[in-house]
Amino acid sequence: MSDTLTRLAAVLEERKNAAPDSSYVASLYHKGLNKILEKVGEESVEAIIAAKDAAASGDCQDLIYETADLWFHSLVMLSALGQHPQAVLDELERRFGLSGHAEKAARQPSA
């Protein structure tokens, strides 16, 4: 895992026990999972809009910025649920060499 993700995961864990007024992440944890999920949704929409704007203008600066926000809030979500970013990287690694169609077909149907 990249050093940046390792360091970020450690900071996210530390902030779980911090006072809500001490940091943005601590305030998100304090507000609960629904607020964190709301932020993930908000950042998803902003990334989509930035992608559409980048396609039209050729300028990807906002797209990179909004994608970083989306990744960050997704990592907060994972951390809130007791998951480490390495689990996502492991899943991506597992998918290497696996056809997207085969991977989708192999998934267990949702109940």
UniProtKB/Swiss-Prot annotation:
Record-level Gene Ontology MF annotations: ATP binding; phosphoribosyl-ATP diphosphatase activity
SUPFAM superfamilies in the record: all-alpha NTP pyrophosphatases
Keywords of this entry: Amino-acid biosynthesis, ATP-binding, Cytoplasm, Histidine biosynthesis, Hydrolase, Nucleotide-binding
Pathway(s) served: Amino-acid biosynthesis; L-histidine biosynthesis; L-histidine from 5-phospho-alpha-D-ribose 1-diphosphate: step 2/9
One GO location term (cellular component): cytoplasm
Keyword Hydrolase found: yes
Top-level taxonomic group: Bacteria
Documented EC number(s): 3.6.1.31
Pfam families: PRA-PH (PF01503)
One GO BP annotation of this record: L-histidine biosynthetic process
Annotated localization: Cytoplasm
Chief localization: cytoplasm
Keyword Ribosomal protein annotated: no
Catalytic activity: 1-(5-phospho-beta-D-ribosyl)-ATP + H2O = 1-(5-phospho-beta-D-ribosyl)-5'-AMP + diphosphate + H(+)
UniProt record similarity statement: Belongs to the PRA-PH family.
PANTHER family: HISTIDINE BIOSYNTHESIS BIFUNCTIONAL PROTEIN, HISTIDINE BIOSYNTHESIS BIFUNCTIONAL PROTEIN HISIE
Name of this chain's protein: Phosphoribosyl-ATP pyrophosphatase
